[in-house]
């Protein structure tokens, strides 16, 4: 009898994995909307891939595998499996990260194409989006295995340029999310101040605004100290000075009387967040300057005693501070994409989302009280399925560039830092500032449109 009950329990779990609606772990999620849970589960797939990439980049993993003669082949072949052994050089390091991230991007791109023009959960494709997680996992694993059988050839070099473009776009998405976050934060605290008739909320906004600007000024000083030299590093000096000037200009525009009249919720908090993010992107750009005099991280990667030489003679490296901070920012932004519920109309338009609290009938209220997922998209989807998966495609290529520190695979299998990475990040910072400036002046330039 116990065995039968256990089998029934397993079949119940299997139905959750293979069915058209998620139910595992839903009791742990307050207000379990299908729209939110599905995004979270897809994000888990992304984080699993990132975890595999981190393991593949670990400097101790490859050396330990080579101690097992029955596992690794010490040759330099381009295939993964050779005469019953594994070419560990293909399974580890930057080449492996390229393949793993290619698999993730292909997986999410497949769903992006599949979910085009899904308008509500009544579309049969919505059941695929919100369920069948076991089969999705099998597809994910299958694509990953296939990616490791791609011959070396020019794959890494071609995929590098895909990563450059995708990462540029994702940097802009991160900035849009920060605009959304800062706007929501500012609006909620202002509402709290009016409701409670307390100046503590205003003091809190002032404190964090001052903190973010102080961090930005500190970042500028540190960038000048560590990434410039007297009589050299002119590009870095121009980038730092120009971005600082642009941030000051944007901050002034944010508090102009006409801007305040058109957008009462705009202010220095949002501008301070954007300024800090711009300094962060500037730091990422300068960490890729291919000049040892102007880039201390380049010395770390290629200095004496700090480079790990693989069995094929190419050089690998472990992460530096920009890579670690970039990974943390990536994780936070990806989670925010999955959980965001925004009331910023301009950001919603750019992000193709319009998250509205659903009106629950009696049956749905009972489902919520029981801790199960319920369908809140019968009358219309709360976000664009296809665009969400496209964001995860961009996230996949961005994390590939972050983990490999934007180094381009060279003919000698060394990872080479190039000016391409520098200019892409600097241009992303300029484009991001222009996007934020547009959110400020759009109501003035287009008075006939509703930006409320």
From Swiss-Prot:
<keyword id="KW-0812">Transmembrane</keyword>
<feature type="transmembrane region" description="Helical">
    <location>
        <begin position="236"/>
        <end position="256"/>
    </location>
</feature>
<keyword id="KW-1133">Transmembrane helix</keyword>
<protein>
    <recommendedName>
        <fullName>Serine incorporator 2</fullName>
    </recommendedName>
</protein>
<keyword id="KW-1003">Cell membrane</keyword>
<feature type="transmembrane region" description="Helical">
    <location>
        <begin position="319"/>
        <end position="339"/>
    </location>
</feature>
<feature type="transmembrane region" description="Helical">
    <location>
        <begin position="96"/>
        <end position="116"/>
    </location>
</feature>
<dbReference type="InterPro" id="IPR005016">
    <property type="entry name" value="TDE1/TMS"/>
</dbReference>
<feature type="transmembrane region" description="Helical">
    <location>
        <begin position="266"/>
        <end position="286"/>
    </location>
</feature>
<dbReference type="GO" id="GO:0017128">
    <property type="term" value="F:phospholipid scramblase activity"/>
</dbReference>
<feature type="transmembrane region" description="Helical">
    <location>
        <begin position="426"/>
        <end position="446"/>
    </location>
</feature>
<dbReference type="GO" id="GO:0005886">
    <property type="term" value="C:plasma membrane"/>
</dbReference>
<feature type="transmembrane region" description="Helical">
    <location>
        <begin position="205"/>
        <end position="225"/>
    </location>
</feature>
<comment type="function">
    <text>Non-ATP-dependent, non-specific lipid transporter for phosphatidylserine, phosphatidylcholine, and phosphatidylethanolamine. Functions as a scramblase that flips lipids in both directions across the membrane. In contrast to SERINC3 and SERINC5, has no effect on gammaretrovirus particles infectivity.</text>
</comment>
<feature type="transmembrane region" description="Helical">
    <location>
        <begin position="387"/>
        <end position="407"/>
    </location>
</feature>
<feature type="transmembrane region" description="Helical">
    <location>
        <begin position="41"/>
        <end position="61"/>
    </location>
</feature>
<dbReference type="GO" id="GO:0016020">
    <property type="term" value="C:membrane"/>
</dbReference>
<feature type="transmembrane region" description="Helical">
    <location>
        <begin position="158"/>
        <end position="178"/>
    </location>
</feature>
<feature type="transmembrane region" description="Helical">
    <location>
        <begin position="131"/>
        <end position="151"/>
    </location>
</feature>
<feature type="transmembrane region" description="Helical">
    <location>
        <begin position="5"/>
        <end position="25"/>
    </location>
</feature>
<dbReference type="Pfam" id="PF03348">
    <property type="entry name" value="Serinc"/>
</dbReference>
<dbReference type="GO" id="GO:0017121">
    <property type="term" value="P:plasma membrane phospholipid scrambling"/>
</dbReference>
<keyword id="KW-0472">Membrane</keyword>
<comment type="similarity">
    <text>Belongs to the TDE1 family.</text>
</comment>
